[in-house]
Amino acid sequence: MRLFLVLFLSLLILPSVLPNQITSDDLIQYRIKSTRAAILDLQSEFGNDYPNARKYLKELSRLEKSFAKGADIRDALKKFRKKALLENPLLRIDGVLCVKRRMPELAEEVLDPKHRKSMFGWGGKVTQGLKALGLPSNHECNSSLSKTGYDNAIVVLDPIHPNREMKTLYTAPDSGYVGEIDLHWNAEKMLFTQSDSMSWKVFEIKIDGSGQRQVSQTPHDVDCGDACYMPNGNIVFGSTASIQSVPCWHGQRRVSNLYAMKNDGSGIRQVCFDQDHNFHPSMLPNGQVLFHRWDYTGISHIYFRQLMVMNPDGTGQRAIYGSNSWFPNSLYFPRALPGSSSKIIAILSGYHGAHRMGQLVILDTHQGFYEEKGLVQRLSGCGQAIEPKIRDNLVDEDWPKFLHPFPLSDKYFLVSAWLEPKGSWGIYLADVFDNLVLVKEIPGYALLEPIPIKKRPEPAIIPSRVDLSKNEAVVYLHDVYAGPGLTGVPRNVVKSLRVFSYDFGYPGMAGAHKIGIGGPWEATRILGTVPLE
């Protein structure tokens, strides 16, 4: 009965979304409510493993009463929230993996508030600084970044004692890039991307920093990275081996598609044959690979970036969010919430502008998959709502900005956040009650890619359906009338389908100035016509 009552009360006091124009007093009241909701949830969820709940609730009530009497409680509330919320039992783990990378200095005139709307402008100082930080623009892959010149390392943070010095696990030699970590669900080893003066490669090390080995085995003119373990023992990763070019860059930048390989780097096979980039592969509990696909194929170029799934062998590819949508432009770094293959946390971002950073959102494909229909919550720490805007530079003016979310549970998350332009990227604890609490930051450095070091359930294994002795495939299209494309067209009117293909451009051979500005940016071919049954 007590458990039910606590849950009921926590639901009653969940903070609502605040209006766009708020005062500092509004924000304090909001954070009192969000903090109370989280404490009640931790008390309900963990009981004696969160022993100070009652004490914290009393202390929060005292702060609330002082605030009602006109006292300035901002500093006291900030300290209290950090103490109470970082005692979350989910943080009692062996540490948090993250990437520590030096941030480039940004000029004061760029950071001036009057330049906030244009600070992520094309070719601007902030844009160049983000690339120096190892963050390619939204329509580029790592191949567009400098291969050397990074001050970075894989480190381990103690979330219970964040003031302790972090342990350095691995530093790339010769100022190479190191990042894009994927921790195996047994928490004993990890994949990561490393660059040298020649190319980008996939490596693996054990959780103690030993046993480093290069996994990807490709020629020096092929880049590899963004790797993810799969439960069948293979690895899915991004590579420029297709030798395609990004059409919006007029053929100047390389495309990264997804490939699969064995654990020793052999047996490389292309599994995504897309016009543009495939990013951020991660595993769903049901055994499917979740990834982000960039599309330009004869559609509204600024707005189509689908979330996709496929089987580990590359079959069964389909969009699960964003097909035919104008909002959001992009959903980067998607990860499934524990135990669910429909609930996903991701970064909502734009087309041009801020590099893959943006709003922290939770989506549920069972709630919807079109525009804002499945976006169930935005987490900002200050009550900001999801606003379905159809806009190119969608999130440039939004603060705070987020990267690399990783769920601790279905309610609590680690995430990298940049609260304001003059700050640093730090590691934060976020929750569904809209709290955002700093775990660790280091002035002058960015702390990115937080991953809790703990064992996770192994995803399901989906048997391979690929017969490599054959060079044909079967495509199932069970209802051409489904979806908005043929809305209002009576059944049995369509008699046949025309099948055509894109010939994706090699470097220097794609782009709007070569084929068409508003239509396809590459050559297309009609393959034939097939009758409908």
How would you describe each model-predicted region?
Residues 162-176, 206-223, 262-276, 311-330, ...:
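Multi-bladed beta-propeller domains
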Residues 91-92, 185-186, 230-232, 284-286, ...:
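Residue-level detector of Asp-centered blade-edge/turn motifs that repeat once per structural unit
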Residues 337-428:
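Loop/turn-rich, solvent-exposed surfaces of beta-rich toroidal or solenoidal domains
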Residues 47-141, 145-168, 508:
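Long amphipathic alpha-helical scaffold segments
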Residues 101-149, 195, 237-254, 291-305, ...:
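Short, conserved, GDST-rich strand-edge loop motifs in beta-rich repeat architectures
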Residues 152-159, 203-208, 253-264, 304-315, ...:
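Beta-propeller blade signature
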